[in-house]
Amino acid sequence: MIKPLGDRVVIEIVETEEKTASGIVLPDTAKEKPQEGKVVAVGKGRVLDNGQRVAPEVEVGDRIIFSKYAGTEVKYDGKEYLILRESDILAVIG
């Protein structure tokens, strides 16, 4: 498994619908970049200038919304993941 360092978070991207409400199938080129995912691993948190560690606000299993162009896409064990900083997470869903 991927173990993120510092304030980084590993997420599994949740794919969006491939059809519009009217039933039109969207090609890959017309799809928006996904902004929703499920947290699969969390780092230990960021370290402040005084050496104190701040624990992450998200946990494994959380569904999140993140910045559109945030993070680095990686492929591991046949699955695609996104590694991003906790500050790129905009909200937790539910």
From Swiss-Prot:
Q: Which Pfam families match?
A: Cpn10
What does the similarity note say? Belongs to the GroES chaperonin family.
Q: Which PROSITE patterns match?
A: CHAPERONINS_CPN10
Task: Please classify the protein's predominant subcellular localization into one broad category.
Answer: cytoplasm
| Name recorded for this polypeptide | Co-chaperonin GroES
**Do you know which CDD domains this protein is assigned to?**
cpn10
State the organism named in the record: Parageobacillus thermoglucosidasius (Geobacillus thermoglucosidasius)
**CC terms in the record's Gene Ontology section:** cytoplasm
- InterPro entries xrefs: Chaperonin_GroES, Chaperonin_GroES_sf, Chaprnonin_Cpn10_CS, GroES-like_sf
Looking up SUPFAM superfamilies in the UniProt record yields: GroES-like (SSF50129)
Fill in the subunit field for this protein. Answer: Heptamer of 7 subunits arranged in a ring. Interacts with the chaperonin GroEL.
Q: Which GO terms describe its biological process?
A: chaperone cofactor-dependent protein refolding
- Location of this chain's protein in the cell: Cytoplasm
- Relate the protein's function as given in its record: Together with the chaperonin GroEL, plays an essential role in assisting protein folding. The GroEL-GroES system forms a nano-cage that allows encapsulation of the non-native substrate proteins and provides a physical environment optimized to promote and accelerate protein folding. GroES binds to the apical surface of the GroEL ring, thereby capping the opening of the GroEL channel.
Q: List keywords of the entry alphabetically.
A: Chaperone, Cytoplasm
Gene Ontology terms, MF aspect: ATP binding; metal ion binding; protein folding chaperone; protein-folding chaperone binding; unfolded protein binding
The record's annotation in Gene3D superfamilies points to: GroES chaperonin
